[in-house]
Amino acid sequence: MEESLVKRQGIAFMSIPAAGVHGVSLINMPRNLTLLGRGVFAARRILKEFKPDVLFFTGGYVAVPVALAGGYVPTLLFVPDIEPGLALKSLTRFADQIAVTTDRSQKYFRKKVLQTGYPLRSDLALWDRQTASRHLGISGELPVLLVFGGSKGARSINFAVMNNLRELLAKFEIIHISGELDWQYVKQNREQLPMELAARYHALPYLHEMGAALAAADMVISRAGASALGEYPLFGLPAVLVPYPHAWRYQKVNADYLAWRGAAIVLEDRRLNDELLVTLNVLFENKNKLKSMRAAMFELSHPRAAEKIAGALIQLAGV
C-alpha cells in the first residue's frame, strides 16, 4: 500500500529488508536479526547513492536499519501518536529534533520537542460539505455517519454496524468504508436492504477521497489511530472511538485524550455491538452536546502541521 501511495505522488520508492525484534520468539529471533542486518547494508547503499541532506522518520521497525546506517545525517523524528511506540523510542537516540502531534507527547522525550500537529494531505481541505455530499450521493435529509476502520477495515466495527444496520438507517445516512477484508459480507447485507434503506447506505471497500467522506459527515465511528488526531479536528468532526484492543496501547491513549478534550466518546471493542446504537441515539438527541464536541474538535486543529514539519526539515538540512 505504501508503495502505491508514494508512487502516485511521483516520488521514488525503495524498500529494504526489515523485521521487528521486540516480543519476537526465540525461534524467530535469528531470522529477524538477519533481516535487520541485511536492512542496514541495503540502507547504507541507498544513502550512499542518494546522499540525503536530512532524514525523516515516523516510526516502525523498517526505520531502524536506516537510522543505524544514517547516523551521520541530521534527523527529524515525528511522533504521530500521543504515546510513542517501542520503535519510535529506540529511534530517539538518533534524532536531532523530535516533532509531536500534541503537547501530551512532550513528557516522553528529553530532547528538544517541536509541537507541529498531525500533517495532512492538502487535498483533504479542498472539500466542503455541499460538494462532498454531491460527490458521494448524500441526500442530506438525515444526519450522516461515517464508519471507517482504516485501510484494512476493523472487523468488530463492521460487524457492529451490520448487526444494527436497519435500526441505524432508520435515523441516519451512512458512509461505510469497510476495508477489503469484510467487503463481501458488507456488500451482501447492503443487497438485502429494502430500496428506501439501501439509498441511505453508501458502502465502499476503500475511498481515496477521504476528504469528501469527512466533510459530508456529522459523526465518525472509527479506531483511534494517529490520523484521528489530525483529520477529525480539521473538519470539527465529533467521534465515537473504538481503540484496537490487541496491540500497543497507543490507540487507547489517543482516544482518551480526545475524550478528555470533550471531542469524542470512547467505547470498548468488546461492548461495541451492544452500546453503539444507544450511544448514537443519546448523542444525537442532545444537540448542545454535539455542538460542544464539534467546537472541542475544531480547537485541536493544526492545519499548518505539514508546513511546520517541512520548515524543521529545511532548517536541519541547512538549505
Language-model segments: residues:
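Conserved nucleotide-sugar phosphate-binding/catalytic loop shared by glycosyltransferases and other
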Residues: 1-38, 44-45, 180, 268-270
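Donor-nucleotide binding loops and adjacent catalytic segments primarily
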Residues: 5, 129-134, 138-219, 251-255, ...
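Active-site-proximal region of nucleotide-activated glycan assembly enzymes
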Residues: 12, 71-130, 135
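Glycosyltransferases and closely related glycan-assembly transferases
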Residues: 42-55, 62-76, 89-97
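A short acidic/histidine/glycine-rich donor-binding loop in glycosyltransferase catalytic cores
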Residues: 239, 257-269, 281-283
